Design a protein with these regions (language model features):
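Structural micro-motif
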Residues: 93-102
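Non-catalytic, surface beta->alpha helical segment in thiol-disulfide oxidoreductase systems
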Residues: 103-135
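Thiol-based oxidoreductase modules, predominantly thioredoxin-like and allied folds used
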Residues: 70-86
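A short beta-strand-turn-helix
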Residues: 24-39
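Typically the conserved alpha-helix immediately C-terminal to a functionally engaged Cys/Sec
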Residues: 54-68
Length: 136
């Protein structure tokens, strides 16, 4: 391997976030199943092309790196808004747009952020989720 190949390969690893959001890809019924198991579920309605969604993902990845308990205690589910934005769950939750983060536990919605990218705001939602998960 020559130096150029090594540098190009190495730069790919540096561009990858240190902690990726370990979210489950959505399938109909998944969120209800997790809730019936007593889990605290953090739902992210997102798209590949949404810049606000990308900012939310970066913030979530950083917060998960800072507080690993979030990833250990909370179930994260990513829902493609383009595919499921008009689906049954979206209707039940009243989801009107992408870049919506919803926190669920049991049969209750514990919090919601619509198009917010503030680290403080997202951390507050994660803290509520962590408290709910630990109390369960």
């Amino acid at each position: 391997m020559n130096r150029r190949d090594f540098l190009m390969t190495s730069s790919c690893f540096l561009a990858t976030p240190a902690v990726a959001l370990a979210a489950q890809a959505y399938a109909p019924g998944l969120v209800k199943q997790l809730l019936s198991e007593g889990k605290t579920v953090f739902v992210d309605y997102t798209t590949e092309w949404c810049t606000t969604c990308a900012a939310q993902k970066r913030t979530l990845a950083r917060l998960l790196k800072e507080t690993p308990a979030y990833g250990q205690m909370i179930e994260f589910v990513t829902i493609d808004y383009d595919q499921f934005g008009r689906g049954e769950l979206a209707k039940e939750l009243g989801i009107s747009r992408r870049s919506t983060l919803v926190l669920l536990h049991g049969d209750q919605e514990l919090g919601r952020i619509v198009a917010g990218t503030s680290s403080k705001q997202i951390k507050a939602l994660l803290d509520i989720a962590l408290s709910a998960a630990m109390a369960a």
